[in-house]
Every structure is written in C-alpha cells, then in structure tokens.
Amino acid sequence: MADQLTEEQIAEFKEAFSLFDKDGDGTITTKELGTVMRSLGQNPTEAELQDMINEVDADGNGTIDFPEFLTMMARKMKDTDSEEEIREAFRVFDKDGNGFISAAELRHVMTNLGEKLTDEEVDEMIREADIDGDGQVNYEEFVTMMTSK
C-alpha cells in the first residue's frame, strides 16, 4: 500500500508526522492523528479517525508509528482517488451540467456505450438510483448508487 506513494509524498508525511511526535520517540498518539491529517489537507470525521486508528494501532496502545501512519495515509489517498473518479463519471452522464442525470441523459450515455435499452429499462435504472423520487439522479444519489456493494 505505502509503496504506491511517491518519495515526495513520503517526505511530506514524515515532516508532518515529526511535527506531532513531540518527544521524538517515533510515535504519535491517536489524539494527534486528526491534527496531522488535517495539516495534510485531509478532513476525516471523528468516526473515520477512530476506524483508521483501530485498523492501524495493532497493539491497541494508543500510539501510531511512522510505518503504520504511511499505510493509513496511502489508504486514505486511494479512497480520495475513487471519489474523484465517481465525480468524473457523474460529469460524463450529466450532459447539460445541471447537477442531475435525467432519463434522456442516461439513455444517451448508455447508447454510446453500446447498451440498447428500452425506455422501461432506462426508467427502472433511474428509479433504482432516485432516492428522493424527483425523477432524476443527483450527485449524492449517484455516489450512493456507485458505492453501494
């Protein structure tokens, strides 16, 4: 996981890590983790922080060493990429850029992808993703659809 980071990213993470490793013993406390991540432009929620800490802090001693920190940051960066990919996919479908995917836009893109769908099939796809029932798919609904397993 950490091997997907550039040397520049690793150096940047090391610098941030060191700023919060007050006594220089090579570990930071879980409380300091949120501050470190925010200094690197990430904005994790408390629940996300707790999840990350639980995943990384194998011995449960409340501190995180640098290799653990690198693994965690690499995971977080990977997640950010997929969010950007979803946003890009939404833009492809949202032809007129109004923030919604209509049945006509969905049909157009699916046809370009070689999928010949009936009006009923297109309407069904919209209905499945259309959480608020307004007949079109907004970005939040699209994300939900794309990220649900």
Swiss-Prot record:
GO terms for cellular component: cell cortex; centriole; centrosome; cytoplasm; cytosol; midbody; mitotic spindle; mitotic spindle pole. Keywords: Acetylation, Calcium, Cytoplasm, Metal-binding, Methylation, Repeat. Residues 8-43, 44-79, 81-116, 117-149 form the EF-hand domain. PROSITE patterns: EF_HAND_1 (PS00018), EF_HAND_2 (PS50222). Ca(2+) 3 binds at D94, D96, N98, E105. Disruption phenotype: RNAi-mediated knockdown in the perineurial glia increases ethanol sedation resistance and decreases ethanol tolerance. It is found in: Cytoplasm, Cell cortex. Ca(2+) 2 binds at D57, D59, N61, T63, E68. PANTHER family: CALMODULIN LIKE 3, MYOSIN LIGHT CHAIN 1, 3. Interacts with Crag. Interacts with stac. Interacts with Akap200; the interaction is calcium-dependent and is inhibited by PKC-mediated phosphorylation of Akap200. This protein has four functional calcium-binding sites. Two alternative gene models exist that generate identical translations. This is Calmodulin. It comes from Drosophila melanogaster (Fruit fly). The lineage of its organism: Eukaryota, Metazoa, Ecdysozoa, Arthropoda, Hexapoda. The gene is Cam.
